Amino acid sequence: MEKILVLDFGGQYNQLIARRVRDLQVYAEILPYTVPLEQIKANNYKGIIFTGGPNSVFDPASPHYTPEILELGVPILGICYGCQLICHMAGGEVKTAPSSEYGKITFKHAPSPLFEEVPELSTVWMSHTDYIATPPAGFAITGKTLDCPVAAMDNKDKKIYAVQFHPEVTHSEFGKQMLANFLFRVCGCQGDWVIDNFIEQKIQELRQSIGSQNVILGLSGGVDSSVAAGLLSRAVGKQLTCVFVDHGLMRKNEGDEVEKTFTQLFDMNFIRVNCADRFMKALKGVTDPEEKRKIIGTEFFEVFWDTIREQRDKGFFAQGTIYPDCIESGKGDADVIKTHHNRVNTPGDVQFAGILEPLCDLFKDEVRAVGEKLGIPKALVWRQPFPGPGLGVRIIGEITAEKIAVLQDADWVLRDEMAKNGYEKELAQFFCVLPNVSTVGVMGDHRTYDHLIAIRAVTTDDFMTADWAKIPFDILSQVSNRITNECAHINRVVYDITTKPPATVEWE
């Protein structure tokens, strides 16, 4: 399989670069700038992309790489900081710009393989404070902007290309074409990264790895674990046992839908552990959000591992780890920046033959594509992000069975209306929150004092920042009318119009 290396120098768009490359049917993987040169040589990459980054090449502490990489004979594309780094390593001159360039800029290019089928003038996205004053020997200037005399350069003999802007973002209107030119015209890629091929190859790999042993998977009903279950089921059938812990904090009917899907559509052993009463008892009287999260997490893993301990011939332990989890769990100088929820540490007293992560090469959109190919219902494949503690962090204050029922009903109405109006895939996330607030209302001739429901809906590319969704008023009105008429004990609906930051997407 053809592979492109995305060499990470700390850029915020490193995953986006890899995704854009994969969108063009070429496999890309991200490695930190600390990866040894010998490892890069051994992988026979078709090309290398240097990412951007927030640093300056003048700073001795900034990310650098050995100049020998420029002599490998492997095509290289430098983006933003990566562009300046190539210049710096090859002996050119980089200076601090008298004025920074940020945002959409008009770019003019000269003939270059990188700019085939790109208009001479186009809009690109700039974000830099340093600039190239003098390109290295052997490099030609191939692009400029009003304030940046060297916005692109190349050394055709060495197949090294560099751009000061970000072709991977949608604001660069012909960025996709530029990346395609690098992959197919410069690197000579054929485009063999196809989801159908991945499924076929992964099933064969799993069968070889597992052999006649069993596999246990913790199934949450989320996208990642559901697709992992589907793939493992296709590979080994009844050798797979899925454990689904139902803590009673799922959305309405969700536990039943998960059980129905995996018992009817797939060949596997399915264990559903209903333990809502246990969770309600543990959460009684608790109002602090962090304490609620801690209790739910602790109880969940105790139930899960107690169930696992009861299984004979455990074999392998499978997880729904996806590619961003791998990047986030071990980034930069091999430092762990966070332990991701999709990577679970197993207790010392539970022994497995090994850990399986069948989706660890895939981004979320690729996971969804695999799920659809496997025949998993779209309602599960396109399920929105759902916190591990479930509705427990969408009920402000103490969690009770009555509050769960109220929130489930309201949330079901919201999801139904969003689906009817085509917003299921349009919005990054939407849900209801039950604040610890009661309000006065009038229903019929009677005064009421019932719950308030808050609706939260956001648009975002990466969840690092988010904007509130501009849902039309007539749709919001219909949602409000249905919730107050169809759901018991609710007399008021409000809409959260706060961005992230200053707010987070979830309320707790």
Report each predicted region and the residues it spans.
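RNA-binding accessory domains that recognize and position tRNA/RNA substrates
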Residues: 1-50, 54-72, 88-315, 330-508
